[in-house]
Design a protein with these regions (language model features):
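Charged, flexible cofactor/metal-binding loops and thiol motifs
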Residues: 116, 123, 140-252
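A helix-coil-helix interface module used to build multimeric assemblies
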Residues: 1-169, 178, 183-187, 251
């Protein structure tokens, strides 16, 4: 039975299940989902919301699931709809009902929000490293290529500025108005490497401006990369013949 299906009289159609399921593309969030859950379980134990032994059992179970996923031994299913329910279902199957306590003081709303931000923090860092490596190489064709150095440097600045708004913790906001449990959001922020906590729960779980801003930064960067690649194509043409592109990076 689906998490939300308590009042329904019959199972949803397979076509609806397939349409609603996001596991095909949010499976990539498994590391962030497990990291967020480990931090949340640690906080629940620390605050005495669940027994420390229960928290330890949940954390051990999550770490084992992470290892199995990376070893290719876990198969996600559409029946569980998304990465969050897949992992929680596997955890409960392995360690019993204590696994259900992981969701204490947490909603899927703030859970997916923290996963999304953790993932984009990682991706922003990877893009920055790539752009840094690219700008480091643009030093031999003098003034012309230095124009690209300036473009890519501004791209890095945009990603760095975008990261300031990504790097804020939504976990602890619950569905939209927090929780009555005595959670420690500052502890969670420190555990997950966020620089600050989002103060408004409704904003934290419902808004995706940070994702749109991230895509905007990617679009501007791709515009600059497109311009650079177009020049390489032009320079390699018969009319110019400035450069020769290696066969390994060419097509017929």
């Amino acid at each position: 039975m689906k998490l939300w299906a308590g009042r329904f009289q019959k199972e949803t159609d397979t076509l609806v299940n397939n349409f609603n399921s996001s596991i095909n593309f949010d499976a990539r969030l498994y590391k962030q989902d497990i990291a967020g859950s480990i931090a949340h379980a640690t906080m629940l134990g620390k605050q005495g919301i669940i027994e420390q032994a229960e928290a330890d059992k949940i954390i051990s179970g999550l770490k084992a699931i992470l290892a199995d996923i990376e070893a290719g031994e876990v198969e996600f299913t559409m029946d569980n709809e998304d990465i969050h329910m897949n992992i929680e279902t596997i955890l409960t199957e392995r360690i019993g009902d204590v696994g259900k306590k992981l969701h204490t003081a947490r909603s899927r709303n703030d859970q997916v929000a923290v996963d999304f931000r953790l993932y984009l923090k990682k991706e922003t860092g990877e893009i920055d490293k790539t752009l840094q490596a690219l700008t480091d190489t643009l030093v031999t064709l003098a003034y012309h290529l230095l124009a690209y150095y300036q473009m890519f440097s501004r791209d890095r600045e945009r990603f760095a500025d975008c990261l300031k708004r990504i790097d804020r913790l939504p976990l602890g906001s619950g569905a939209l108005a927090g929780t009555t449990y005595n959670t420690d959001r500052d502890f969670l922020a420190k555990e997950l490497g966020f620089s600050s906590v989002l103060p408004n729960g409704m904003d934290a779980v419902a808004d995706r401006d940070f994702a749109i801003e991230f895509v905007e930064c990617c679009a501007v960067t791709m515009m600059h990369l497109s311009r650079f690649c177009e020049e390489l194509i032009l320079w390699s043409s018969v009319e110019f013949n400035f450069i020769e592109i290696d066969d390994a990076f060419s097509t017929g």
